[in-house]
């Protein structure tokens, strides 16, 4: 992933645009995914991500986290990610779609275009979160967004979820 793409994903978390993700912003971002994290767990996650200990996550720290989630193939995924963001429709996507595509790709670890129970569980676990560690938790979260009932989330379902306020909003 290049620095432009990383910054687009970062901006989805950096709600006030000051270049730093606070604990509150991180918590709000997780809520958009339908993930409600207790304060103590959010503190532990911030401690894990906040390498310099200033209480906020900057874009460099976020990049380290992002690469650790994607694993060793992060560099190899960048061209496929950019092509996927364009979607083969000839025109450049708008920034919102591109940012959502990058966020989607954090969860779609194998790059097949779907977020599975195992992928969701893996990402939540690498963030140090207890919520979503069981397959049943992840299955429930996915079922709230899975419009076509195939047991996984595609990009269209992900965009609908994000625009509708996260997993929780679609869960009724």
From Swiss-Prot:
Keywords: Calcium, Metal-binding, Repeat. One of its GO terms (molecular function) is calcium ion binding. It comes from the Eukaryota. Residues 1-36, 37-72, 95-130, 133-168 form the EF-hand domain. Ca(2+) 1 binds at residues 14, 16, 18, 20, 25. Ca(2+) 3 binds at residues 108, 110, 112, 119. Ca(2+) 4 binds at residues 146, 148, 150, 152, 157. Potential calcium sensor. Ca(2+) 2 binds at residues 50, 52, 54, 56, 61. The keyword Calcium applies. Gene3D superfamilies: EF-hand (1.10.238.10). Pfam families: EF-hand_7. The keyword Nuclease does not apply. This is Probable calcium-binding protein CML28. InterPro entries: EF-hand-dom_pair, EF_Hand_1_Ca_BS, EF_hand_dom, EF_hand_pair_protein_CML-like.
